[in-house]
Amino acid sequence: NDYHPDHRYTGVLVQDAAFMVGVPNVAPDVEPLRKNPVFLYFQDNFKKPNPFQPDIAVDITPVIDKKLAGLDAHQSQFYEWLPWIGNYEEEVPKDPAKHKAYLLQKRVSKPNPEVQKSLEKWYGSARAAKVLYAEAFEICEYGSQPTEAEIRALFPMLKGN
C-alpha cells in the first residue's frame, strides 16, 4: 500500500522477484537461491486493500536525529510537493533551521496501539513504554517466514530484549 504509484508498482515487482529468486534458469548467469530471503513491508497508514500488520517494531528514539536528517535530505518531497498535494504549504517553515522540528511533528508519529503491542513483544513492557519513536515492519508472505531467532539476527538491536 502506498500513495505513490512508483512505490506500489515497485512493491509488486519485489513480490514477483521474491518467488523468482529460487527458480533455476530465470537468470542463467546467476545461481538461484536455495532459501528465499525475508522480505519486509515498511509501515503505512493505508487500510485498503490490506491494513499494515506490525510484525516487527524497532525503537528508533536513539537515532531519531539520523532519521530526521534523512527525511530532510528529500527537500522537494517534504517541503514542496507533499505539502502542495495536501494543501498545507503554509505550514512548512521558511527557515531551514526549523525543518527538522516540522518533520518531527508532521512526518514522525508516536507508536500507535498496534505498534506499541509489537514493541512490547520485542522489548518487553517496561522498555516499550519508554519508546518515543518506532519503525515497524510486516513480514511479506512471499518470502521466507523467519523464526523469532532469525528476526533477532536480522535486527541486532532486538537481541537480549
Model regions: which residues?
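C-terminal accessory domains and tails appended to enzymatic cores
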Residues: 27-28, 35, 49-50, 56-161
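A long, hydrophobic alpha-helical segment
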Residues: 43-45, 51-52
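Internal, well-ordered alpha-helical scaffold/interface segments
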Residues: 12-16, 37-40, 65-69
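Active-site beta-strand->loop->alpha-helix modules in alpha/beta enzyme cores, enriched
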Residues: 1-27, 52
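Active-site cores that bind ATP or allylic diphosphates and position pyrophosphate for catalysis
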Residues: 23, 33-37, 41-42
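Short, structured patches in soluble enzyme cores that scaffold and shape functional sites
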Residues: 41-44, 60-62
